[in-house]
């Protein structure tokens, strides 16, 4: 279910502010979004996988907290990120 190293590196390269930036909210949200999308595809085939569903809900909550933090600290960055990732908010 996890992202491959190449997928992670591509996401980090796209959203990082400076080289080696893996901790900024944009990078963290983008990685969580990719993991969430991958897990959602998993649940199409495995409807009864409740253990993984718990992990999915945890990731969604973590992403929500990061997005709330970013919205409070820098609204234009928040708006650009959700538009780029295609999130509904």
UniProtKB/Swiss-Prot annotation:
Entry keyword NAD: no
Organism name? Cellvibrio japonicus (strain Ueda107) (Pseudomonas fluorescens subsp. cellulosa)
Gene Ontology cellular component terms for the protein in this record: cytosolic small ribosomal subunit
Please name the gene that encodes this protein: rpsO
At the highest ranks, the source species' classification is: Bacteria, Pseudomonadati, Pseudomonadota, Gammaproteobacteria, Cellvibrionales
What Gene Ontology molecular-function terms does this entry list?
Answer: rRNA binding; structural constituent of ribosome
SMART domains the UniProt entry points to:
Ribosomal_S15
Q: What is this protein called?
A: Small ribosomal subunit protein uS15
Q: What does this protein do?
A: One of the primary rRNA binding proteins, it binds directly to 16S rRNA where it helps nucleate assembly of the platform of the 30S subunit by binding and bridging several RNA helices of the 16S rRNA.
| UniProt cross-references to HAMAP family, sorted A to Z | Ribosomal_uS15_B (MF_01343_B)
